Amino acid sequence: MRIALGIEYDGSGYFGWQRQAEVDSVQGQLERALSIVANEPIGLFCAGRTDAGVHATGQVVHFDTNAIRNEGAWTLGVNANLPDNIAVRWVKEVDDSFHARFSATARRYRYVIYNHSFRPGILRHGVSHYHGNIDADKMHQAAQVLLGEQDFTSFRAVQCQSKTPFRNVHSVNVTRQGMYVIVDIAANAFLHHMVRNIVGSLLEIGLGNQPLTWMGDLLALKDRNQAAATAKPHGLYLVDVTYPEQYQLPKLALGPLFMLD
């Protein structure tokens, strides 16, 4: 049978999602816990491979197993064998046609900026700290040029392995909640470091270092070297993955929990 899981994790203690031989990873910890509960080796497929230090409240994974367990047994059993910074939010048996990555029609990320003169003591691994007066409204205006299917070469990592630089951005919103600035962006898929590279350039506009038209200029240039530095990983969350209605996957609050939805 095929099982889908919704998971959340604090990525600050891991070298990213993907299993690696020499370092700790979210995938490695989940596969270990699932293999204990299933009493057989389990291999996982995920909706989006997050980088080192990046978090998730809405990651979706799937695996195949011969083990017969009810949803409660999977959830409680796996959580009991996971570190405290990874948790299963829901479990659902799915059709064999479901694939966590290839069935997904959209991914959504939130980047949380703590905009204050002094660094945070609490949530220091859950937000990215930037001082200076950030104009969230300008960032939002500038970001609207990113909508639609476009060539995002200027915002892809040098090591990106995607065969095409084209992605379709469905929505992008920048809002302020007190000391926090939140960049919320959804697309059919993302290039390596695409969200953090977009945020890095939007911050230059929000801080007044670049004009509102700069994002459009960068898109036209198709040159990563012309854009701003990659934003820090700590404030980034994979908050949602969209699938066709036929799979009837649970929908929970997006998070992160310390932000208002």
UniProtKB/Swiss-Prot annotation:
Spell out the CDD domains in the cross-references.
PseudoU_synth_EcTruA
Catalytic reaction(s) noted? uridine(38/39/40) in tRNA = pseudouridine(38/39/40) in tRNA
In this chain, substrate is annotated as bound at 109
HAMAP family per the record? TruA
Q: What EC numbers are recorded for this enzyme?
A: 5.4.99.12
- Give the signal peptide as a residue range, or say none if absent: none
This protein's species is: Shewanella sp. (strain W3-18-1)
UniProt keyword list: Isomerase, tRNA processing
Question: What protein is this chain from?
Answer: tRNA pseudouridine synthase A
GO molecular function (one): tRNA pseudouridine(38-40) synthase activity
Q: What does this protein do?
A: Formation of pseudouridine at positions 38, 39 and 40 in the anticodon stem and loop of transfer RNAs.
Any single biological process term in GO: tRNA pseudouridine synthesis
Which residues carry out catalysis?
A: 51 (nucleophile)
Family statement drawn from the similarity comment of this UniProt entry: Belongs to the tRNA pseudouridine synthase TruA family.
Identify the taxonomic lineage of the organism of origin. Answer: Bacteria, Pseudomonadati, Pseudomonadota, Gammaproteobacteria, Alteromonadales
Q: Which gene encodes it?
A: truA
Q: Which domain of life is it from?
A: Bacteria
According to its UniProt record, this protein's enzyme class is isomerase
Which InterPro entries is this protein grouped with?
Answer: PsdUridine_synth_cat_dom_sf (IPR020103), PsdUridine_synth_TruA (IPR001406), PsdUridine_synth_TruA_a/b_dom (IPR020097), PsdUridine_synth_TruA_C (IPR020095), TruA/RsuA/RluB/E/F_N (IPR020094)
Binding partners and assembly: Homodimer.
